[in-house]
C-alpha cells in the first residue's frame, strides 16, 4: 500500500551546505522530518554540484515521518549573474543596464536548465532565459 502524503515543502539550499540551523532546521522540524537524515541525504546528493550554488528542492513528507526529495537545477538568475559576473541585477531594468550577455551563454544556460523548463526545444528555452535577462537589466548581444 502506498504511503499517505502529509505535505510538500519547497526550499532553496546551497549545494553541499545543508545543516540543521535556520532556515532548514525549523522548516523540517515543525513538520516532523528527521533533520539530520535530510541534511546527510541532501549533501550526499548535491556532492557533484558546484558548492554553494542555490539548489531548489521539493521535499515530500509522509505521515509515517519519512520523506523523499527532488532536486532541481539552480535558478536562471544564478546562471545569468554568474555568466555576466554580476552581484545583482539592475535596480531599474529597461532604463539602466546592469551588463551584457551573449547568445552563446544564453544557449548554454538553456541547455543546462532544459529539464526544468516548460519548453519544447532549446530555442523556446533561450527565449525564456532572454526574458529573465531583460527583467534583470541585462542586454542580450550577438
Swiss-Prot record:
GO terms for cellular component: cytosolic large ribosomal subunit. One or more lysine residues are methylated. Keywords: Methylation, Ribonucleoprotein, Ribosomal protein, RNA-binding, rRNA-binding. One of its GO terms (molecular function) is large ribosomal subunit rRNA binding. It comes from the Bacteria. SMART domains: RL11 (SM00649). PROSITE patterns: RIBOSOMAL_L11. GO terms for biological process: translation. Disulfide bonds: none annotated. CDD domains: Ribosomal_L11 (cd00349). Coiled coil: none annotated. Belongs to the universal ribosomal protein uL11 family. Forms part of the ribosomal stalk which helps the ribosome interact with GTP-bound translation factors. This is Large ribosomal subunit protein uL11. The gene is rplK.
Amino acid at each position: 500500500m502506498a504511503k499517505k502524503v502529509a505535505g510538500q515543502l519547497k526550499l532553496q539550499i546551497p549545494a553541499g551546505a545543508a545543516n540543521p540551523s535556520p532556515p532548514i532546521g525549523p522548516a523540517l522540524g515543525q513538520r516532523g522530518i528527521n533533520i539530520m537524515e535530510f541534511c546527510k541525504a541532501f549533501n550526499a546528493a548535491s556532492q557533484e554540484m558546484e558548492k554553494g550554488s542555490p539548489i531548489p528542492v521539493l521535499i515530500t513528507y509522509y505521515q509515517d515521518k519519512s520523506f523523499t526529495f527532488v532536486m532541481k537545477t539552480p535558478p536562471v538568475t544564478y546562471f545569468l549573474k554568474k555568466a555576466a559576473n554580476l552581484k545583482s541585477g539592475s535596480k531599474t531594468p529597461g532604463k539602466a543596464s546592469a551588463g551584457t550577455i551573449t547568445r552563446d551563454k544564453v544557449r548554454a544556460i538553456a541547455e543546462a536548465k532544459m529539464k526544468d523548463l516548460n519548453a519544447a526545444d532549446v530555442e523556446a528555452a533561450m527565449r525564456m532565459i532572454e526574458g529573465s535577462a531583460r527583467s534583470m537589466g541585462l542586454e542580450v548581444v550577438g
